[in-house]
Amino acid sequence: MGIHLGEIGIVLFPWFLWLSLFLSCGYAAITISSPLTLGQTLSSPGGFYELGFFSPNNSQNQYVGIWFKKITPRVVVWVANREKPITTPVANLTISRNGSLILLDSSKNVVWSTRRPSISNKCHAKLLDTGNLVIVDDVSENLLWQSFENPGDTMLPYSSLMYNLATGEKRVLSSWKSHTDPSPGDFVVRLTPQVPAQIVTMRGSSVYKRSGPWAKTGFTGVPLMDESYTSPFSLSQDVGNGTGLFSYLQRSSELTRVIITSEGYLKTFRYNGTGWVLDFITPANLCDLYGACGPFGLCVTSNPTKCKCMKGFVPKYKEEWKRGNMTSGCMRRTELSCQANLSTKTQGKGVDVFYRLANVKPPDLYEYASFVDADQCHQGCLSNCSCSAFAYITGIGCLLWNHELIDTIRYSVGGEFLSIRLASSELAGSRRTKIIVGSISLSIFVILAFGSYKYWRYRAKQNVGPTWAFFNNSQDSWKNGLEPQEISGLTFFEMNTIRAATNNFNVSNKLGQGGFGPVYKGTLSDKKDIAVKRLSSSSGQGTEEFMNEIKLISKLQHRNLVRLLGCCIDGEEKLLIYEFLVNKSLDTFLFDLTLKLQIDWPKRFNIIQGVSRGLLYLHRDSCMRVIHRDLKVSNILLDDKMNPKISDFGLARMFQGTQHQDNTRKVVGTLGYMSPEYAWTGMFSEKSDIYAFGVLLLEIISGKKISSFCCGEEGKTLLGHAWECWLETGGVDLLDEDISSSCSPVEVEVARCVQIGLLCIQQQAVDRPNIAQVVTMMTSATDLPRPKQPLFALQIQDQESVVSVSKSVNHVTQTEIYGR
C-alpha cells in the first residue's frame, strides 16, 4: 500500500517547477496572498525596471525602491519609504485589507503605505515597463494608485509635475539628503502657477534656480531649447481652473532620466548601452544661481561670468560691489519722467524711452498681458508708470514687468529681447558721449605715440636698450586682479579680526604647516571656528597662486571639497579663511601609530569614495573642468564624521569647453604624486590627477607614505610593493596590518581597490581610467581591466617635497625643490 518514489516525483514535480520559476523570474504582481519580502524582486514585463529592497552603501537601513534592472551600478529612480527605513531582518510589501499598498516590518507595524484605500482589496500591484508602480483593480482594471503621482528625486518618461490651486495638490521632485540617504534633502523642483509657468528649484523657502517662462516648445532661460531643439517635454495650463501639467515624453528608444541631486544640480541622462551620458546640467555657472547680480543687475555668461548693471543703472552700494557682493544689485542713475498715454511718435524731451537688450533670459516676476502684437505691448508698458520693462516673445506674447528686474542673464547666443524703461536723457546723451570719448581717446593716443617716439630717439642716442618699468603706488593694487564678479559671495576679513580670532597667530592655535605657510585655528566673535592659512613670503605661492585659489574655490561647492569662507589682504600679508575641520588632515591619522586605529577599513573605504566623488565633481560635474595638480594625503581634510574634503587649490588649473590637456613652463606638485608625463614634459590633464589619486589610494590602503616606504633589500617603492602584492595575493596583503586583524574587512573590496589604484598609476596616461570610470569601478562588481606593470619611481628621501620645474620647449633648464 506504500507510495512509490516515482509517484512522489510525479506529484512534486509541478511544485518544484513553479518554485524555480518563482525564484528566477521574480513576482508578476503583489497581492494579499503573495507579498514581496526581503531578497525578492518584482520585474516589469519587458525587464527594464525592477522593484525590491535595497540598502544604500551596504548600511543596515533597508528601503523599497525601483531601479533599472540590467544596468550596473544600480541607479534607484524611486523610493517608497524614503523617510523611514526598515531596520528589522524581516519585511513585507503587501496589499492591505482596504486595498492600500503597505510595507510591514517584522512586528507587523506599518512603515509606509500608499494612504489611498480603494473600495475593496480585490486588487494587485505591478510594475510597468515605464518604471511606474501601479495598483490595479482586479475587476475594472482601473488604476487606483501609481508611483508617478508620488515622485522622488527622478523623472522618467511619461511622468509629470503638476499643481492644482483649487485642491492644493502638487507634484514635485525632492532631492535625496545625500548620496546614501534617500530621505528628502534641501532641494525641491516644482512647476510654478505663473502665466506662463516655469520650473524652479527651491532650496528651503528660497528660489535657487529657475528655468524662465515656457514658450510653447521650451524654456526661455535654457539656450539649448532653441527653435531647432526637439523637446522631450510639454507644458499645459488651464488658467481658469488653476491647473498646470509639465510632462516628460519619450522621444527615443534610449533609457533616459531627469534627477535633482543632493547638491542641487538638475541633470538629464541617457543610457547609450555602456554607460550614462550627461546631456544637460543646471546650474552650470554662477549666472544660473537665482538673483546672482541682484535687482537690475545683469549676469553675463562670458568667461568668466561677471555681473554688471543694466544700461542706465549703477551699483546700489558701490563699496559692496568692490568687495565682491553684488546681491544688492543696481539702482537708476536718472529718475523716470513717466509721462503716460504718449505715443512713441510724439515723444518729446523728458519722455521715457526704452532700451532694447538682446540675448537675455527674461527676468522673474513677469506678468502676462493679452496684447496682440509688439507695438501694443510697447504702448501698454509706456502708458503704465509702474511698468519697468516689456518683452514680446514668440510662443508667449507680451510680458510686462511692474517690479524690480531680478535674475536677468545675458547669453552670448540665444535668449530673448528685453526692452528696459529709461529716462530719455540716458539715450539722448549716449551719442554725444561717444563723440567726446572718441575725441579724447584719439588725443591721448596721439600724445602717447609722440611721447614714445621722442623717448625712443633719446634712448637710441644714449645707446641704451629700452627698459620698461611699472610702478605701483598702492600696496594693495594687485588686489584689483580680483574682479568682484569672480568672487561673488566671498567675505573680505579685516586683519584685526583675524588677529583677534587666532590670538595674534599664537603658536598654541597652530594646526600645522602647509606647503605655502602655517595654518591656524581661529574663533570669530560669533563663536564660529575657522581655519586660517597664512601665506609666507618665501612659500612659493605668489600673487598668481593666491588669486587663483580665491577665484577657483569660491566657485566650487561640493560636500567633498573644503569651503572657502573668505580672505584677508593687508599689505604683504595674504590669508585664506576656510571652514574649520576638527579632524585636520588625513595624514594626521593615517601615519600615526595610535590614531590610525580610528580609521578602520570601512572608514578608509568611505574616504576613498568621498575623494573620488570630489574629484568627479572637479573633472566632470562642476561649472568648469578643474585639474587639481596637487592631490595628496595631506590635502585631504576630515570633518567630525571622517568625511573627506579636498583642499589646497593654489596650483589648480581650469579647462573650458572641449579642452582636455595643457602644458606649463613651470611644473609644480609633490614628488611621488606627479605623473610621468607631467614631471618630465609639463603636460597635465585629468589623467595627472588620476595618477595622484592612485598613489593616494595605495597610501590609504597600506597606511604607508609614498615618500618614505622601503621594502626588502631591493628598496622597493610603495608602488612596486603594491604590484607584487597584487600579483601574489590579489592585493589583500597590501592592507595596513595594524587594522587588518581588527576590522575583518571584505577582502574582495580591498583587492578591488588595490587593482583600481594600479590602473590609476599606469605609465601611459591613455592606460589610466578617467574619474567617472573609477567611481563606476568602485561601486560595481564588473571585472576590472588587468593593469600593466607600472613605472616605479626611484626611492626618495623621507620628506614630502614639492617640486617646481621651469622648462623650455625641449629640455629642462632648472629645478627647484621646496619642503612641503
UniProtKB/Swiss-Prot annotation:
Membrane topology, from the record: Single-pass type I membrane protein
Reaction it catalyzes: L-seryl-[protein] + ATP = O-phospho-L-seryl-[protein] + ADP + H(+); L-threonyl-[protein] + ATP = O-phospho-L-threonyl-[protein] + ADP + H(+)
Modified residue annotations for Phosphothreonine: 664, 815
Record PTM Phosphoserine, positions in chain: 539, 554, 634, 647, 707-708, 808
Residues holding ATP: 511-519, 533
Annotated disulfide bonds: 287-299, 293-307, 377-398, 381-387
A Pfam family it matches: B_lectin
Catalytic site: 630 (proton acceptor)
Entries under InterPro entries matching the protein: Bulb-type_lectin_dom (IPR001480), Bulb-type_lectin_dom_sf (IPR036426), Kinase-like_dom_sf (IPR011009), Pan_app (IPR003609), Prot_kinase_dom (IPR000719), S-locus_recpt_kinase_C (IPR021820), S_locus_glycoprot_dom (IPR000858), Ser-Thr/Tyr_kinase_cat_dom (IPR001245)
Domain of life: Eukaryota
Enzyme Commission number, as recorded: 2.7.11.1
Domain Bulb-type lectin positions: 29-148
Residue span(s) of domain EGF-like: 283-319
Gene Ontology MF terms in the entry: ATP binding; calmodulin binding; carbohydrate binding; protein serine kinase activity; protein serine/threonine kinase activity; ubiquitin protein ligase binding
Domain Protein kinase, first and last residues per copy: 505-792
Domain PAN: 338-422
Cytoplasmic side: 456-820
Keywords from the named record: ATP-binding, Cell membrane, Disulfide bond, EGF-like domain, Glycoprotein, Kinase, Lectin, Membrane, Nucleotide-binding, Phosphoprotein, Receptor, Serine/threonine-protein kinase, Signal, Transferase, Transmembrane, Transmembrane helix
GO biological process, one term: recognition of pollen
Ranges in the topological domain labelled Extracellular: 29-434
Signal peptide positions (record): 1-28
Transmembrane segments: 435-455
Name of the molecule in the record: G-type lectin S-receptor-like serine/threonine-protein kinase At1g11280
